[in-house]
Amino acid sequence: QGNTDNTIQGKIEQILSRMTGHAVEINGAGRTDAGVHARAQVANVKIRTDKTAQEIQELLNHYLPQDIAVTACEQAPERVHARLNAKGKHYRYRLCDGGVPDVFARNYVCAWEQHLDVDAMQRAAAHLVGTHDFRAMSSVNKRFKKSTVRTITQITITRKPREICFDVIGTGFLYNMVRILIGTLVEVGEGKRAPDSMPAILDSLDRQQAGVTMPPQGLTLETVLY
């Protein structure tokens, strides 16, 4: 993952390394792009220590910056791996459309000038549920040789008083996939695309055929499923 010094992973590794006196490497359930939030990221790490899980959690929260918190810590079986054992992930994208955004939520909600048609977006989203090749809705480069087939089990779009929530649950996601998927649905909501155009976009395998990559601040990894 390159230089992790100024990442959440890097901050935790630094504290654990000082605590144990040896190098520490964390295995996270998945990466999040810069600016994307994680409410319930999961990670595992192997360390040598006499401290209890509770003591480790308290030590981490004492030294971590205020915008990072360890909400649970427990000893796990030897073969547990946060990423390899994960069955799926739940992402939520929050968007304020056509109104005055909540200034206190500006770091967590994307402000969008145009009012969006939720019904049209829901019809489009129905075409994306299931197992498909999502290469067109990802930022993977042409040299990417691994499979770009992924399974989305659920997409829910809910209008709330001051925002629209897009909830996307799937077994795994490609680089920028959720943000591009939402960007494509938003263009449907704007009337720029037809709801039934989704299959053709997927079949094209062409990033240029899909919508914009939405800003990162509206996206949160809500849950890792096991």
Predicted features and spans:
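Structured-RNA-binding interfaces characteristic of tRNA pseudouridine synthases
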Residues: 1-226
